[in-house]
Amino acid sequence: MEKLTILLLVAAVLMSTQALNQEQHQRAKINLLSKRKPPAERWWECGIWFSRCTKDSECCSNSCDQTYCELMPFPPDW
């Protein structure tokens, strides 16, 4: 009877450990997926034409004149 009790306790500990590991793995997977945004959401994170900016990456056109987003980047010889 003692051996059966010990066996049941060991089985319970193993099952709870496995369940805990699965839960943490699933939570990490959800966190990883939630960091990604669809392209439509990423588009609106950039500034449209004539929005305030300080660097090119803040503008949808990828062209900032240090004050406002430009409609499009101009050639360097302008």
From Swiss-Prot:
Subcellular locations according to the entry: Secreted
GO molecular function list: ion channel inhibitor activity; toxin activity
Positions annotated as propeptide: 20-42
GO cellular component, one term: extracellular region
Domain of life, per lineage: Eukaryota
Keyword Repressor: no
Main location: secreted
Expression sites (tissue/organ): Expressed by the venom duct.
UniProt keyword annotations, A-Z: Disulfide bond, Ion channel impairing toxin, Knottin, Neurotoxin, Secreted, Signal, Toxin
One Pfam family per UniProt: Conotoxin
Signal peptide: 1-19
Domain notes: The presence of a 'disulfide through disulfide knot' structurally defines this protein as a knottin.
Function description: Gamma-conotoxins may act on voltage-gated non-specific cation pacemaker channels (HCN).
Family: Belongs to the conotoxin O2 superfamily.
Protein name: Gamma-conotoxin-like TxMEKL-053
